[in-house]
Every structure is written in C-alpha cells, then in structure tokens.
Amino acid sequence: MSLLAKIVDGKNLSFEEAYELFNELKGSDGVLIGAYLAALQTKGYTGEELAGLARAMRDSAVKLDLGKVADTAGTGGDGSSTINVSTASALILSAFTRVAKHGNVSITSKSGSANVLEALGLNIRVSPERAREMVESTNFTFIFAPAYHPALRPIMPVRKALGIKTVFNVIGPLANPADPAYQVVGVNSPELLEPVAEALEFLGVERALVVHGSGMDEVSPHRETLVLEVGNGVERYTLSPEDFGIEPVKPLPCSSPEESAARIKAVLGGSGRREDRDFILVNASAALYASGVAEDFREGLEMAREALGQGMLEKLEEIACLSKS
C-alpha cells in the first residue's frame, strides 16, 4: 500500500514512514503534493508523524550549528490577526539567552515573523556564518525557513494555492535547523497540544511549552491558556492572567506587518498600549520560563518588564545592522 493510500484509508504512519513521506514530497509534482497535504489534513496527524516529518525536514536543511538556543513560534492560522507576539517575545528573550527564531512569511495570516522582522529593519536572509555571528554578538538570529529548507521549494506554492492550514503549519515550529533545546510552540487548536508535545519528546527537546490561549496560538493575556510542558515527561496545566500577576486584558487586532512592527517597537522602547505590552509580556514570560531563565511565570513577567526600555531598541538596531553587514 502506498503512503498516500494509507493516509486516505485513515491509517497512521510510523516515524519512519513519515520521514519517508517528506522525502517523497520534496521530489513530487504539485498535484501529488496537494493530494498528500489535503489527505493528511483530513485524517489529522499523530505526534509520531509530526516528529518523522520534522526530523526529515531538519535533516534536509542547510546545516547550522549555533550551540544551545531557544525558539518561540506558533502554527499560525488562528484567525486572530494580532501583533506578531512570538517575534516580540523572542527579541525580549534574547536579552537573557541565545535565540534562533525560525519562521517564514505569512501563509495563512496577515503577518508572519519574517514580514514583521523585515518591517523592523532586519535582513531575514542571513547565511549560516552570519547567523552564528549574530547569535554570538547579540544573542539573536532569524532562520528564514525558505532559505534554510531548499526541499520546501516545490511545496511552498502548493501550500499557498491551497489556502488552508496544512501539516506544514504544525511542523514549521518543530523543524528549526538550529535544533533548539528550549521552545515555546503555540498551536491554533487544543487538539494539537498532545501531538505537538509528543513530537517534541520524540525530537529530544530539553524543555518546551506547547500552548493554546483560548483560540490563539499564543499565551492569552485575558483568558485561560492550556499548556503542555515537555521535559521530564509531559505535564498538563492551565494558566490565567493572574498566574503572571496581571489583570486580564484583551489583545487588539492588527492589520499589517508594518503596524505590528511599529507597535512592537513602542513596547520594546518602554511605551506602547497596555493591551500590546501585557500580551507581549506574558508570552516573553513563558519563553523565559521554558528556557530555564525564570523560575516561574511571575518572575518571568517581571524580568521581561524590566527589560523594556532598557536598551531594547538599541539592541534591535544592532541586530538589524549586523544582519545587513
């Protein structure tokens, strides 16, 4: 039975079969790629399948050795159209530890991490050598998925043409070629929490949080956030704004990468609206906790708050300049 027939039949793939599937996809034409993506989306995916696809994607990527790094990313596709908070929290996290932010331009939302970082002045297409230099000098680099995953080239236009969420929304945050030790992964559906956590265990992450914040692939600053913490096994719990020491506040919508960048800069500079600031802070707190920098979420939020206005805009300028040199 072919892999496609097995998926259409509703049967799950093993890690090895999922690994093989990625290698088959990268050599296929658009019709077959579309069939695979639609069939997988209809069937749903297991943690083992996600891990096999992500491992194959990492193994096919441009090699990158940055040492022990952290990453913050979401699956996108939640329809919330808020500021790009995972990018903002990654920048704050880099004030404390090394970050290799893996991301792409928008596929299913108005603004991907690459779009926002370009609007913030970064060159998003940096070589492995420049990425290492950036991490060593600033604690931050951006890993632009299309530049580091040449195997995705035949797949990207099919994803765009389909215009629906696919398995690549989910494995994108799992396929960072820098092999991060620490991660926060936001998922757009509660049903993805367990398979993504299982995949992270398969991939050998040291510590990770998989989060879904009341409809968002982020930590919510105004409602409950479901969390699966991966480390020594998997622990499930719920976070509320009170766990961070803040009053609930609803995130505001955002219409473009340029608007997102301007609002992120305002917060990094120590101003900005409370709705943006607290949204960024709770997510930065989660990243600081997942990376082992903060002992708990309240401490993480206070550490992130203290970083705002304390040279963060200058740090952003340094990152942008180094990315272009």
UniProtKB/Swiss-Prot annotation:
- Which is one Gene Ontology cellular component term of this protein? cytosol
Which annotated residues bind 5-phospho-alpha-D-ribose 1-diphosphate?
Answer: 74, 77-78, 82, 84-87, 101-109, 113
Molecular function terms in GO for this entry? anthranilate phosphoribosyltransferase activity; magnesium ion binding
Q: Which domain of life is it from?
A: Archaea
Q: Where does Mg(2+) 1 bind?
A: S86, E218
What biological process terms from GO does the record include? Answer: L-tryptophan biosynthetic process
- What does the record say about how the cofactor binds? Binds 2 magnesium ions per monomer.
Q: Which residues bind Mg(2+) 2?
A: D217, E218
Does the keyword Iron belong to this entry?
A: no
**InterPro entries from the UniProt entry:** Anthranilate_Pribosyl_Tfrase, Glycosyl_Trfase_fam3, Glycosyl_Trfase_fam3_N_dom, Glycosyl_Trfase_fam3_N_dom_sf, Nuc_phospho_transferase
The EC code for this enzyme is 2.4.2.18
Positions that bind anthranilate 2:
R159
Q: Which PANTHER family match?
A: ANTHRANILATE PHOSPHORIBOSYLTRANSFERASE
Q: What does this protein do?
A: Catalyzes the transfer of the phosphoribosyl group of 5-phosphorylribose-1-pyrophosphate (PRPP) to anthranilate to yield N-(5'-phosphoribosyl)-anthranilate (PRA).
Q: How does it assemble?
A: Homodimer.
The protein's name is: Anthranilate phosphoribosyltransferase
